[in-house]
Amino acid sequence: MSETNSGGKCPVMHGANSTENRDVMNWWPEALNLDILHQHDHKTNPMGEDFDYREEVKKLDFEAVKKDLHALMTDSQDWWPADWGHYGGLMIRMSWHAAGTYRIQDGRGGGGTGNQRFAPLNSWPDNVSLDKARRLLWPIKKKYGNKLSWADLIILAGTVAYESMGLPSYGFSFGREDIWHPEKDIYWGNEKEWLAPSDERYGDVEKPDTMENPLAAVQMGLIYVNPEGVNSQPDPIKTGEQVRVTFARMAMDDEETAALTAGGHTVGKCHGNGDAGALGPEPEAADVEEQGFGWSNPNMKGKAANAVTSGIEGAWTTHPTKFDMGYFDLLFGYEWELKKSPAGAWQWEPINMKEEDKPLDASDPSKRHNPIMTDADMAMKMDPKYRAICEKFMADPEYFKDCFARAWFKLTHRDLGPKARYIGPEAPAEDLIWQDPVPAGSTDYCEEVVKEKVADSGLSISEMVSTAWDSARTFRGSDMRGGANGARIRLAPQKDWEGNEPARLSKVLKVYEQISAETGASVADVIVLAGSVGIEKAAKAAGYEVRVPFLKGRGDATDEMTDAPSFEYLEPVADGFRNWQKKDYIVKPEELLLDRAQLMGLTAPEMTVLIGGMRVLGTNHGGTKYGVFTDREGQLTNDFFVNLTDMAYSWKPVGNGTYEIRDRKTDQTKWTASRVDLVFGSNSILRSYAEVYAQDDNGEKFVKDFIAAWTKVMNNDRFDVQA
C-alpha cells in the first residue's frame, strides 16, 4: 500500500462508512427505534430469498455428520489441543452457552439462530475460548455446506460429545435457521461494563427474585450465575438461591437444574492455569490478523493444561471424558475447602483426597491434580432441596441419566418450538408438556356452514375480531410458543387474563363451543374463522367484497396438555393493537407495541396497517374510543390514517398518556387518542406509512394489506402446515 498519504489528511470521505459516524439514534436517543422490526431480511442473507433451510436440511446425511463429529472429538489439533485428547467438554460448553441464553420471560435468546457467532455473545467473558470450538467445527460446516446450519451444528456438537463419552441421547432435531447479523431485539442488560456487580440488575441482590425482567443471568456477560459466588464472594447457600431463580427463568425446575448442573460438570474442566490479565482482547476487539479469534494466550505453548477461561482451574471428576456418577461420588464423598486458583479465582477443593480419585493432568498423564467444585456445585450439596434431589440421583444412576438426557434435550430444544417443527431421524416421538402439544384438528367440516352460524350468532364485529386477535397475539417468534392453534384462550390461565376481558370472552366462547359441537370444527378454527367473518362483514360495509384466507385443521388443547405456570409468561402486559396496557410502566406504550409486534413477526408496515384496521373495527379493550378516528366504526376503512394526517385537527395532551383531537377552528374535541395512536403521526417513519394508507387511491390497498397482515398473525403458529 502506498504511503503517499501518510501523515496527511484522510483520503476518504468521513460519514457513512466511518466508525465515528453518529446515526439518528445518537442524535435523538429518545426517538422510537424501529430497527427491531427490520432484522434478518434477504438483504443481509447471502443465501437469497428462495433458500429454504428447513427443506434443505432434510437432504443432509445425518449419520455421516454424526460420524464426522465423533471423529472430531478425539482429533486433537496442535493449534488448540484438546484436554485429555478429547474435545467433548469444550463442545458441550459451546452448545450449553448457546442454548443457555434462553429466557422464558420473552422467549428470546437460545441456540436457535446461531447467534453465538456474532457480537455480543461471541465476545462475552463467559464465552472465552468458544471461538476455538466453532473454528474446530468449521471443516464439518464447510463439508456439509447449505444442508447444515451453524445453529444446528453448534447444538448437535454438544449432543454428540455426550454420546461419545457414554451418555445415550434422548434425541435431537434439526431445523434451526441461521441469522446473519446480531439481533437487535434482545435486551441483555443495561450495564456499561462486563461482569458489573449483580447489584445493577437486582432490586435487592439478597433477594434473587428481584432480578430485572426479562433477564436470567446474574451479571452482564455471564450465561447463568457467577461460579465463584454472588458477586465473586463464595457462599453456596446464597449462590443456590440465585441458581434456582436463574434456571427457573430459563424454564427449568429444581430437578432439571440439579440434573443439568451435575451432568454438565461430570465431564470437562474449568481453565484458570495462568494470568487472566495476560489474555488478549475478545474477538470483536482483536486485531484483524487474529481472524476472528480472541483472548490470545501467550502462555498456552501448545498445552491444553495452560488454558485460561473462567479463571477457575481443574476438573470436577476423576474421569472427565466419561459420563458416570463421579460428580456425586466426589462432591458427597469428600469435604471441601475454599482455595484460590492460579488465576486468583475462588474455587472449592477436596480435603485429603485419595490420589487415585484425582483427575489426570489435561496434557501430562504422569501428573494428577485436585478436582474442583464451583460455588454452584457446592450449592447442590448444601441447599436442602438440591441435596435431596442429588441423593435421589445417587440412589438411582439410571434415573439420573434419564433426567439429565431429558433436561439436556429441553435445554437445547426449548426455543425450537413444538414437535411439529422437529426434523430428522432422531427427533423423539414422545409428547412433552413443555412442547405445548396440540392435537390434530379436523378438516372434515364445511367452512361455509361455520361462517353462516357465526354470522347469525348475534355477536358483533368487535367481539369476533377481538377474540380471534386475543387468541393469536400470544404467539412469540422468539421461541415459537403461543398463537391461536390449541385454543388455549379457553383454558387457565389465559381465560382469566385481564387483557382478554374474561366476561366478554366467556360469552363469546359459549357461542363458539356450541358452533364447534354442531359442525365438527375445532373451537380454535371457529375462533379464527369468526374473525374472518367479522372482517369480511366490515369490508363489505365499506364497499369491498373480500374473502379472508383460512386454513382448517387447528386442534383444541386440553388442560392436561397445558403447563399452566409456563403460560403465565405469555400474558400480555400491554397490547397497543387493542389500545390497552395493564398498568403504567417505565417503558413507553409505543415501545411496548414494538416489542409485541416484533415477537409476532410483524414488519413496521404490517404493524401500521393492523393498528389502523383494529381501530376502525372498534376492537379497543373495554370498548374505549381512543384512536377510533372514524364516524363509521365497524367498517374497514382507512379513516384512522385519513384523520390522523388531517391538518384540520390539533392534538392536545390531557394527562395520563391520553390526548384530545380538536378541530382547529372550533376547538371542539372530535376524538381522543393514546400515545400509541399518535406515534403513527409523530414518528417520521411510521408517518410515511400512515400517509400511504391515507391517500385517496389507497383505500383498497389498505383493506388488502390489512387482511394479509391479519392472516399472517392467525397462521403464525401453523407449524403443522409450515413444516
Curated annotation (Swiss-Prot):
Query: What is the protein name for this chain?
Result: Catalase-peroxidase
UniProt GO cellular component terms:
cytosol
Its lineage opens with:
Bacteria, Pseudomonadati, Pseudomonadota, Gammaproteobacteria, Pseudomonadales
PROSITE patterns found in the cross-reference section: PEROXIDASE_2, PEROXIDASE_4
Note on cofactor: Binds 1 heme b (iron(II)-protoporphyrin IX) group per dimer.
Q: Which CDD domains match?
A: catalase_peroxidase_1, catalase_peroxidase_2
Instruction: Give the first-level EC class, as a single word.
Output: oxidoreductase
Q: Kindly provide the PTM information from the record.
A: Formation of the three residue Trp-Tyr-Met cross-link is important for the catalase, but not the peroxidase activity of the enzyme.
Looking at the record's lineage, which domain of life comes first? Bacteria
Please give the family membership noted in the entry: Belongs to the peroxidase family. Peroxidase/catalase subfamily.
Question: What are the site positions for Transition state stabilizer?
Answer: R93
Necessary cofactors: heme b
Q: Which organism was this protein described from? A: Marinobacter nauticus (strain ATCC 700491 / DSM 11845 / VT8) (Marinobacter aquaeolei)
